[in-house]
């Protein structure tokens, strides 16, 4: 009888210890899980910076190029977290695509679109919104564009954190315009180009809604 009581106590103690271990494991998982994504993002940014530094070692303005690469990597992460989610959200929500399929399609076609047809958009962002000649020096223009890239990335990061879908285009165009005004005044901005861009922001959702309505007619 005493042996049975002792065995029962041992089992109860073992159950309590296993329960504590299970609770500790759950708590560790709960704390660590939110840190995985930021850690992977940081690793990606560091790798991009290292690759840029090693590839361009010995080139003039290497530091500026490395900083630009790091900011570009940070911006790319934010585009994936917010802008790509905007595009793929309806398809995933309608169960037309799985999350893995949506990510794969986004990775392929976002990259292909930028490489095949992104030149004109890059030119507009780089030279069409603010005139490089309005700056006192090339370095001033470079740092203005850096500031625009960083400000847009920070804003998209904040919007992603609060779960707000925002436009990368709006963010970077606003960043470039603001940086140009801060560096060289309102005269630095090409207001005709800005008017066309702003008009497209109004036309795009209306046109998209009309086309969607026609498809479902």
Residue ranges and their predicted role:
Residues 2-217:
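Alpha-helical transmembrane segments and immediately membrane-proximal extracytoplasmic
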């Amino acid at each position: 009888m005493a042996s049975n009581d002792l065995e029962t106590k041992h089992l109860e103690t073992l159950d309590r210890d296993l329960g504590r271990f299970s609770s500790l494991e759950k708590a560790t998982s709960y704390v660590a899980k939110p840190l995985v994504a930021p850690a992977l993002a940081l690793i990606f940014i560091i790798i991009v910076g290292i690759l840029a530094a090693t590839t361009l070692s010995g080139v003039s303005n290497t530091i500026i190029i490395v900083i630009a690469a790091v900011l570009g990597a940070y911006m790319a992460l934010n585009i994936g977290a917010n802008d790509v989610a905007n595009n793929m959200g309806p398809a995933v929500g309608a169960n037309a695509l799985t999350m893995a399929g949506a990510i794969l399609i986004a990775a392929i076609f976002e990259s292909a679109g930028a490489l095949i047809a992104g030149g004109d958009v890059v030119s507009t962002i780089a030279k069409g919104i603010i005139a490089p000649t309005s700056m006192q020096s090339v370095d001033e223009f470079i740092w203005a564009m850096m500031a625009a890239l960083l400000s847009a990335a920070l804003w998209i990061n904040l919007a992603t954190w609060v779960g707000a879908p925002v436009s990368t285009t709006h963010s970077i165009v606003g960043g470039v315009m603001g940086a140009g005004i801060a560096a060289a005044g309102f005269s630095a901005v090409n207001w005709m180009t800005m008017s066309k861009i702003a008009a497209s922001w109004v036309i795009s959702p209306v046109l998209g809604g009309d086309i969607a309505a026609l498809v479902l007619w």
